[in-house]
Amino acid sequence: MNRVSYFIVNAFTTELYKGNPAAVCLLDSTIPESTMQKIAQEIPVPTTAFVQKKDNDFFFRWFTSVAEIPICGHGTIASAFLLWQQGIVPVDSSITFQTLSGPLQARWINQQVEITIK
């Protein structure tokens, strides 16, 4: 069985254990939707984001413990922050997330994440 690693990232705060937590799973390859749902059920946070790089964009899905959801602000902010913090994307570059709700763009501006719905 493939391993899926995840990070817990707190959005809307600069302090540990504050803000709104989200789990972010950085995927190397596609996993079944049923597996995403099972992972989200196991992680004790409101939302789990699944992020997979494809070409110049990232494909992105959000799950609660009950179901997939069409969009999640704090999950998007947490995921973008993690991609910059881990050096996967340079901080001076924007990130385009392809989602079931359409593309989202994230930019790092003045030490904050700005999300734009395209």
Give the role of each language-model region:
Residues 24-28, 51-52:
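Short beta-strand-to-turn element immediately C-terminal to the catalytic PLP-Schiff-base lysine
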Residues 1-18:
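N-terminal, positively charged, Ser/Thr/Ala/Gly-biased leader segments
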Residues 13, 52-53, 108-110:
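Short, low-complexity Ser/Thr-rich regulatory SLiMs
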